[in-house]
Amino acid sequence: MPIIIISSDSYETGREISKKIAKATEYNYVDREILAPIAEKFNLQKGQVIKALEETPSLFGLSAKLRNRLLACIEEATVGKLLGDNVVCHGLAAHLYVLGVSHLIKVRVLSDSKKLASQLSSEAGGSADKIETLLKRKVKKRKQWSLDAFGLDETDPSNYDMVINLSQIDQDEATKNIAGMTVYRKFQPITYSINCLKNKDLACRARVVLMEQFPDVKVRADGSTIVVEVKIKKRTKQKIAGVIKKLAGGVNGVEYVEVHAASDFR
Amino acid sequence: MEAKKLKIMVIDDENIVGKRLKPALEKSGDIVETFENGESALARFDEEPFDIVVTDIRMEKIDGIEILERVLAKSAHTKVIMITGYATVEIAREALSKGAFDFIAKPFKPADLRAIIKRASKELRA
């Protein structure tokens, strides 16, 4: 069955509607609960891992190196869950890194900012207008974050299969519409899209292993072959290629490793 | 009881594809005919329908999507499998919404195609 990825300008709204969709479709729900093992691996609080999904690197926040490693681990964990099929995924930015998979339905849910602001104002105090301005600022920050982390603008509607504005359509109706998309033939899994997801999974797993020593590494996979791009000086190329081949060769599912010296790193 | 042999049509303008797939698919005992363009394939399909059509998408004059539409218009039960070296989400979704049974990106192993054909034949025999 198709996989549904929900992105929203409000984490709470996205979570609420995603849970409803999961219930309506009887799919599994995947959200930030899967981040606990990553926090444990890095000896961090879960909140610090979540920062990687929300904040750009800064002097007083996460370093770029740690942020990138955390994001790589989040990608790996998320893609592993998506392979399980029958999934509604939210809060893990999967819409920004799982690309080219035709049975993945990407939906952007726009919250009713006025309603959300007045709700927050009655809960926490402060004027609704001020809170609405803060929410708008948060969306701008999110856009910046998505461009910095994955080179994609998550507020751009062209990155989605459907965009729903909750100020115009109520949540239950939206849930019905999104769940209804799962029966469309065009979104059913096919050999091509399943292979794309498997390739992504293998590349993510290999990248996580390699990043410990090669933070800027790029990996793509095709079947059991992986292609690794890494910054290498000419004189050390052979030695480093050997290390990469040994490390990546130990990843379950990898049979052949190609190593290329990277020419263009974003 | 022995299962009825399937009639499989392979269409690809690169003749190496047909040459390699024909013996690989015939291993299962099915009847395989190969074509290098849409015109001759559709003319043959007009003579008698096939159970399974495996077609490339990017071809001159008649492309794989047109073949898919014309085959299904003539024989709704035929399973059409699309193969392409230029796979994209958009093309895959277009092919599926027009009724393709499955879609696989080139290069692939003959065993991958055999697995798809096995699924198609199960549906045909159900």
Predicted feature descriptions by range:
Chain A
Residues 4-21:
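Glycine-rich phosphate-binding P-loop
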Residues 35-86, 126:
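ATP-dependent small-molecule kinase phosphotransfer cores
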Residues 100-123, 131, 135:
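Conserved phosphate-donor/acceptor-positioning beta-strand/loop module used by diverse small-molecule
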Residues 170-188:
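Short, structured interface segments
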Residues 188-217, 239, 243:
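N-proximal, solvent-exposed amphipathic alpha-helical segments enriched in charged/polar residues
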Residues 211-235:
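Short edge beta-strands and adjacent turn/loop segments
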